[in-house]
Curated annotation (Swiss-Prot):
Pfam families attached to this UniProt entry: YbeY
GO cellular component, one term: cytoplasm
Gene transcribed to yield this protein: ybeY
Compartment(s) of residence: Cytoplasm
Enzyme class: hydrolase
Gene Ontology molecular function: metalloendopeptidase activity; RNA endonuclease activity; zinc ion binding
Name recorded for this polypeptide: Endoribonuclease YbeY
Cofactor(s), names only, from the UniProt record: Zn(2+)
Cofactor note: Binds 1 zinc ion.
Length: 154
């Protein structure tokens, strides 16, 4: 299996409690499982202002969000290893981890896995798609040594 090449961009004023590029690569590799090519993706960690702006611009949602996925699409005749970009909001991830009583790094891992699956074309708009995506996310998270991300323990 070939490693995903990660271009990590940190556009957050607070850089504490962020995953390392090695952690992000491990989590993305588990989701992408590249066999032949060596895919490349950008992971941009942002603050709420940038997340809010992008979420409003591209999804029409007037609030910051945990992860946005921007798949890279090019003509079929051009072979490029780029699979896309993930934009992850540090404050939203931290807040969700606290609210859901999950370890912070487990939630970061889940956001990388979730976003990576979106880059591969998975979605959760329809119920059957959501079930398949959640099943895959759970399988990947368990393989990484984390718990089921959809079970909230209280």
């Amino acid at each position: 299996m070939k490693n995903v090449i990660i271009d990590l961009q940190i556009a957050s004023e607070d850089v504490t409690n962020l995953p390392s590029v090695e952690q992000i690569q491990l989590w993305a590799n588990a989701a992408i499982r590249a066999e032949n090519s060596q895919p490349e993706m950008t992971v941009r960690i942002v603050d709420e202002e940038e997340s809010h702006h992008l979420n409003l611009t591209y999804r029409g949602k007037d609030k910051p969000t945990n992860v946005l996925s921007f798949p890279f699409e090019c003509p079929d005749e051009i072979e490029l290893p780029l699979i896309g970009d993930l934009v992850i909001c540090r404050q939203v991830v931290e807040r969700e981890a606290t609210e859901q009583e999950k370890p912070l790094m487990a939630h970061w891992a889940h956001m990388i896995v979730h976003g990576s699956l979106h880059l591969l074309g998975y979605d959760h708009i329809e119920d059957d798609e959501a079930e398949e995506m959640e099943r895959l996310e759970t399988e990947i998270m368990l393989s990484l040594g984390f718990t089921d991300p959809y079970i909230i323990e209280k």
